[in-house]
Amino acid sequence: QWVEGKFTRLFEERWSAWNQLPSVATSSWTGGALACMDYFQLKSKRVLVPTNTFMATPLAVVKSGASVVFGDCNRSDLCLSYEAVVEAAARESLAAVWLVHIGGHIAFDAPKIAEFCRQKGIVLLEDCAHAHGASWNGQRPGSWGDAGVYSFYGTKTVSTGEGGMLVSKHPALIEFAKGYRNYGKPTYEVEGLNYRMSEFTAALGAVQTARME
């Protein structure tokens, strides 16, 4: 079985055990990011993105029909600053924030940004493409916000060549993402496309996840 089989489920289970959140495997980071953007209905809305990130982050916003607002980063960790989020929220009608964990560690301002977004009703999404294996006081990436998305591209700490993983504390988003990655199956209520992870890719990921500390 090349797709939708036991290795995809095993990879998701092992990632969930490490990340402490329900997980959905995708064919890329982009697939997971687009699922988040669609689920939170961010089309035509303003989304804050840090200036220091890979093009995938703002492009996911653009492809979802939302508008990109750029925010400055801290010199100390090269990640989005709390001050930039506060300033952008005062200046713009922000609907969401992409918090990118650059360089293998959690963004230093993650707790403050998360609390601010909760108070203001702003969706907080975490780009965890660099954050495999990271934690802060036992808390894993993707758990500060509404969702987190990992990449398993060839340059990542955990690599399967290509691939992604969406994690979230919201059960409804997890179910949405399962349909989104597979043309909306089985009910076709979700307007998804093909973002499935292959069984070969998932097998590589499951083995590596078992070796993570």
Question: What are these model-derived regions, one by one?
Answer:
Residues 34-92, 96:
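Conserved PLP-anchoring active-site segment centered on the Schiff-base-forming lysine
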